[in-house]
């Protein structure tokens, strides 16, 4: 797999379930079931990504468990516990023009309407009402900021997102 084809991590494999190699699944998708919309999966085992197919999955109480191709014993499943689950970027669904994957916003420069470079998006936090960009300020920030928290509210604070140019234009006071 080439370096520009780094998998997008959608979850991880949890503990074993039963003696036939089933594993609990932790999904980072909006809904737990969403992770099963993608096939094949890539599993990062011993630092290497490899392809794997989900044979079947089901709810087991509040947990979700899955049977993976080639994993038929509890011992083999234990070897996969805590391995990341990923997919290739081209497997991701296309989004409407005004929606973005978080991974595309990470690393974008944040510039306000006065042209002030406020820093780079380091993380995004889901708060319930709206997502919040955690912007790591530049080393020599004129306002002495280390980090800024900007609500991701398009049309109000977020004026333009240029994913290709890795830049976000905001209406935000750099001293706030």
Curated annotation (Swiss-Prot):
Major subcellular location class: cytoplasm
Any single biological process term in GO: rRNA processing
Compartment annotation: Cytoplasm
Statement: the UniProt record of this protein carries the keyword Cell division: no
GO cellular component annotations of the record: cytoplasm; ribosome
Family annotation (Pfam families): PRC, RimM
Highest taxon listed in the record's lineage: Bacteria
Annotated keywords: Chaperone, Cytoplasm, Ribosome biogenesis, rRNA processing
GO MF term set: ribosome binding
Signal peptide stretch: none
Annotated InterPro entries: PRC-brl_dom, PRC_barrel-like_sf, RimM, RimM_N, RimM_N_sf, Transl_B-barrel_sf
NCBIfam families: 16S_RimM
Function summary: An accessory protein needed during the final step in the assembly of 30S ribosomal subunit, possibly for assembly of the head region. Essential for efficient processing of 16S rRNA. May be needed both before and after RbfA during the maturation of 16S rRNA. It has affinity for free ribosomal 30S subunits but not for 70S ribosomes.
Protein family: Belongs to the RimM family.
Entry remark concerning the domains of this protein: The PRC barrel domain binds ribosomal protein uS19.
Subunit annotation: Binds ribosomal protein uS19.
Protein name as annotated: Ribosome maturation factor RimM
Taxonomic source organism: Shewanella sp. (strain ANA-3)
Gene giving rise to this polypeptide: rimM
């Amino acid at each position: 797999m080439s370096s520009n084809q780094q998998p997008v991590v959608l979850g991880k494999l949890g503990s074993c379930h039963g003696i036939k190699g089933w594993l609990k699944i932790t999904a980072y998708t909006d809904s737990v079931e969403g992770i099963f919309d993608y096939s094949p999966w890539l599993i990062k085992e011993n630092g290497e990504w490899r392809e794997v197919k989900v044979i079947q999955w089901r709810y087991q109480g509040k947990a979700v468990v899955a049977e993976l191709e080639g994993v038929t014993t509890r011992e083999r499943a234990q070897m996969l516990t805590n391995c990341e689950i990923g997919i290739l970027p081209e497997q991701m669904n296309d989004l409407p023009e005004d929606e973005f994957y978080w991974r595309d916003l990470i690393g974008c420069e944040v510039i306000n309407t006065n042209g002030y470079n406020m820093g780079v998006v380091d993380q995004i936090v889901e708060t319930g009402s709206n997502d919040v960009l955690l912007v790591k300020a530049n080393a020599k920030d004129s306002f002495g900021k280390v980090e800024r928290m900007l609500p991701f509210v398009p049309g109000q604070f977020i004026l333009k997102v240029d994913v290709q140019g890795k830049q976000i234009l905001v209406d935000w006071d750099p001293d706030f």
